[in-house]
Amino acid sequence: LQAYVVQHENEGYVLVKDIEQKRGKVRAVALYNPSEQPCSFTVPLTDLEFEGTVKVRDLVKHRDLGKVDGALKQEVPAHGAMILRIEGKKRIEPTVYEAEWAYLPLFDDLGKNPNAVRYTPQEGTSGKMIVGYLGGQPENYAEWKEVYSEKGGQYRMTVQYTQGAGRQLELTVN
C-alpha cells in the first residue's frame, strides 16, 4: 500500500502507511518538510489511527525515541524528512477519508488535457486540497477502495464538496 497524506503542518506533510500487516498495529510515518524553515509537527495519534500509547523508532538513525501518548511531536529541519516506525496496542477505525486518497481512473498528471481530473490546493479544506473536474462521463469518478469498518453497521456520513452551477453529486455505497 502506498503512503498517504494525513495532515499538513505549516508547509510540511505527514504521510502514513501500514507495514508488516494491513490494518496491523505497526505503521510507518514520514514527516516531510520541503520548506526553507524548520517545521514543528504535532500529530494527534488518532490521525494515525492509534489510541493510547505508542512506541516510536527513528528508522533512519536506528534509534528508539520512546513512548508517546496523545500526539507525536517532532521538529524537522528545512528540506528534511523523518521516517518513523510507530507501534501501538490499539488501532482505531479511520474517521476521515480525504478526496486525495480516492482512486481516480481518469487522473492525468501530465497536464495534456486542461479539463482532466486534478488536485488543486484550496485553503479551508481539511486536507488543503480538492479534486477537480470529476464527472462528465461514467468513467470519471472518485472511489475510495480502502474504506474500513471492523464491525460494519450503520454510520452517519458527511460529504463536503464544491460545485459549479447546474452540477450534482451522485453517491453510491455498497
Regions of interest found by a model, annotated:
Residues 12, 23, 36-39, 64-66, ...:
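Flexible loop/turn segments at secondary-structure boundaries
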Residues 34-50:
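Surface-exposed beta-strand/loop patches in extracellular or lumenal glycoproteins
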Residues 32-34, 46, 59, 162:
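Short, loop-centered acidic/histidine patches that primarily coordinate divalent metals
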Residues 1-35, 115-128:
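Glycan-recognition and catalytic regions of carbohydrate-active enzymes
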